Amino acid sequence: MSGLLNFGVPKGSLENATVELFRKAGWQISISSRSYFPGVDDDEMNCKLIRPQEMGKYVERGTIDAGIAGRDWVRENESDVVEVCEMVYSKVSRRPARWVLVVTRDSAVQKPEDLHGATISTELVGFTKRYFAERNIPVTVEFSWGATEAKVVDGLCDAIVEVTETGSTIKANGLRIVCDLMESVPVLIANKAAWADPWKREKIETIATLLKSALAAEGMVGLKMNAPNDQLEAITRVLPSLKNPTVSHLFNSDWVSIESILPEKEVRRIVPELIKLGAEGIVEYPLNKII
């Protein structure tokens, strides 16, 4: 029995990367600048554009059945949802985001305890309050509407809690990271009632499997070739494969067909070696998913 899954697509910085990930996983999501309701080529899905900061509360309520948001915002809102899986991707890289405690470069602060009685500015107010309360460090945490880094530079606060991937922008602005408070990646979350529904759970699990397989395929390619049977062992030693390469004997021949999956960046290094070992008909092909 089929049904309809209400799915939240994160609006903002994760939006384009999420749509592209779904495309690689097999779904075409089309977003219009005039609508908050993206089209999707799946009659069993209804998509809505929702800010990651609000995704957790809507999933918890059951307004939507499932969606993608940063784990940081799920924790910020203390959302009571099912975390189905995590997926490491962002608008610019494939690395986790970090929420860091930041001060000016010449600040005397070296650790969180040095901020006793200080004022901290951040978008992540709830988490930051809990972080310092758990360590019995009295601070005042203020919500920042933006330009958070400028506030500590201008002396409007003593420190900030800000999100970064590399820390390069923080350093470029004359600031210093005291420590990391939390690492965050996008997570697929589900409403508990939806997760208890057999059809919706299977649909959500299918989405999770295909999204993860699309991420797993990034930077990977397939390589196949024909080679003399007596060079098989030498060639398989050269090939960096997820598992052992697939080998098939060619009909009425002392040659074999070899197929392997490997990082794309390795191809330029190993192809000359394969040719020296007698490989012929080498074909490289892209991968959309590795399941």
Swiss-Prot record:
Coiled coil: none annotated. Its cofactor is Mg(2+). GO terms for molecular function: ATP binding; ATP phosphoribosyltransferase activity; magnesium ion binding. It is found in: Cytoplasm. GO terms for cellular component: cytoplasm. SUPFAM superfamilies: GlnB-like, Periplasmic binding protein-like II. One of its GO terms (biological process) is L-histidine biosynthetic process. Keywords: Amino-acid biosynthesis, ATP-binding, Cytoplasm, Glycosyltransferase, Histidine biosynthesis, Magnesium, Metal-binding, Nucleotide-binding, Transferase. Its main location: cytoplasm. It catalyses: 1-(5-phospho-beta-D-ribosyl)-ATP + diphosphate = 5-phospho-alpha-D-ribose 1-diphosphate + ATP. InterPro entries: ATP-PRT_HisG_long, ATP_PRibTrfase_cat, ATP_PRibTrfase_HisG, HisG_C, N-reg_PII-like_a/b, N-reg_PII/ATP_PRibTrfase_C. Feedback inhibited by histidine. Pathway: Amino-acid biosynthesis; L-histidine biosynthesis; L-histidine from 5-phospho-alpha-D-ribose 1-diphosphate: step 1/9. Its EC number is 2.4.2.17. It comes from the Bacteria. Belongs to the ATP phosphoribosyltransferase family. Long subfamily. Catalyzes the condensation of ATP and 5-phosphoribose 1-diphosphate to form N'-(5'-phosphoribosyl)-ATP (PR-ATP). Has a crucial role in the pathway because the rate of histidine biosynthesis seems to be controlled primarily by regulation of HisG enzymatic activity. This is ATP phosphoribosyltransferase 1. It comes from Geobacter sulfurreducens (strain ATCC 51573 / DSM 12127 / PCA).
